[in-house]
């Protein structure tokens, strides 16, 4: 077990696959830094790459704060003490800024489902970060995806069963599913 670990993701519809990833990473470290990417969807860096789905506005309906709250409440609900993790912005689109948010002596825990996952591992290693791939799976092996969660919200389907209870509660209390349906 390492002292400090880190993970990163968009978490645009925190789902059970994200929780599997977060909880496995937490098992491997005493303190976990959770980096949230695309924290400023209006950033010029994001706009320059808007042709990629992960940078399009409709793929990013939840604000940084909303995602921070969903993650925090879901991690605590899962039994992780609040003092054992933190959540920070994570500028994957501007890698040279990452050290402003995550110290260089952490171990990044990654999962790989596609080339984008491999690219992130490679980018972090080039920057001098130690990485550990927790698993590599095919896209078909995903528990679910944020895309699927958002699609079910838009269609009035059963998105709730794909998300942690605390995240569902937060979404419903703040009527966030309406943001996805716009």
Indicate residue ranges for each PLM-predicted region.
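Nucleotidyltransferase catalytic core that binds NTPs
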Residues: 1-182
